């Protein structure tokens, strides 16, 4: 039995299914999570399917979470999507179910779950969920297609990132057969509030770039307050440094309320996820996240990026 058939058998076997994803969700986290819920309810309407986690205000237009009680987990199937390691799972009750499935596209360095399906060649978790539906000949609603397409758009940077493959385009084309306004969705994902535009201007004005193309910017709590922004909202400018032709790798250090820094690492071609692993993080070869606990560690991370280009 293939992995997809095994997952489908588990879905069929449970009356209650609860779906989790990672903290601080992006479109792929929400798209794969809620898209999977929509797919299951379309094919098995008698089942109770819920999604749990923090409601991210900046993505409220895409999807909302359900109210999930502790009792809901009794005898339930739990599926975690788009989450490489256990500490990043939003809502730690994921262990309270009867059976746990991991579905992901990140490097499998934390092999959790009673059943795990990881495809690092997939552009996104949403691509995997769509592939799962297609291979099992499952129905998709228009809403499911919209969510999954949004997830693919998000993690491929609208098909610009190297993770985009011919299979990605084939799967995306299948989703476009459904009735949703994909052009409006793309416009929504490509737009941002004026305060983000001002932050982007700040980034371009203050970005530090070394002679080999390693760049960095620090967004302190003072800067976030100045622009009236949350950490989650700064994700809108993560790709901005890469628009500069001389920039090859970059780090965005976002100071958190407790004083530590969330570090977003990106690269055009040089592998940077080993740097992330050394600093309480990880991720894809060209798109990773890390954590820094001092300005000195910020310097260390930037130096490591610079060393990659020497």
From Swiss-Prot:
It is an enzyme of class 3 (hydrolase). Pfam families: DHH, DHHA1. Its cofactor is Mn(2+); Mg(2+). One of its GO terms (molecular function) is 3'(2'),5'-bisphosphate nucleotidase activity. Its EC number is 3.1.-.-, 3.1.3.7. Disruption phenotype: Increased sensitivity to superoxide stress inducers methyl viologen and menadione. Grows poorly in the absence of cysteine. SUPFAM superfamilies: DHH phosphoesterases (SSF64182). It comes from the Bacteria. Keywords: Exonuclease, Hydrolase, Nuclease, Stress response. The keyword DNA-binding does not apply. It catalyses: adenosine 3',5'-bisphosphate + H2O = AMP + phosphate. Probable bifunctional enzyme which has pAp-phosphatase and may have oligoribonuclease activities. Converts 3'(2')-phosphoadenosine 5'-phosphate (PAP) to AMP. Complementation studies suggest it also has RNA oligoribonuclease activity, although this has not been shown in vitro using 5- or 20-mers. Involved in superoxide stress response and sulfur assimilation. Part of the SMU_1296-SMU_1298 (rpmE2) operon. Is able to complement a cysQ mutant in E.coli. PANTHER family: BIFUNCTIONAL OLIGORIBONUCLEASE AND PAP PHOSPHATASE NRNA. Belongs to the NrnA oligoribonuclease family. This is Probable bifunctional oligoribonuclease and PAP phosphatase NrnA. The gene is nrnA.
